[in-house]
């Protein structure tokens, strides 16, 4: 989220109030996520009982496609946070400007990452798990392909 906020701050937006409000909302989202992580996660907690066997990754998950698939999905989901921030800023400021021109590149970038991530995941599931094709998946897996 910080990276997308930084990229938006470099963007030339004609309305400075919109830019300031968007970055304020984006930074508030970052603050909320960081606060949630700080107060709910403890990296020093011990797991009981300790692992008796090795803690290797499942062999099905040891695939080059899965090294790219989750980060692509993450970039897509996080990329939509700046779209949310711009949309909320326009609603708060009650601007009549053509904010679609501002939103369009951010939506396209985020959508591209999501599409690539879902495509990689679908490709991996098709050849690795042998599910027999996309039409034999259950509805949850097919719903990820919907816009």
What are these regions (language model features)?
Residues 1-147:
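Polytopic transmembrane helical bundles with strong interfacial aromatic enrichment
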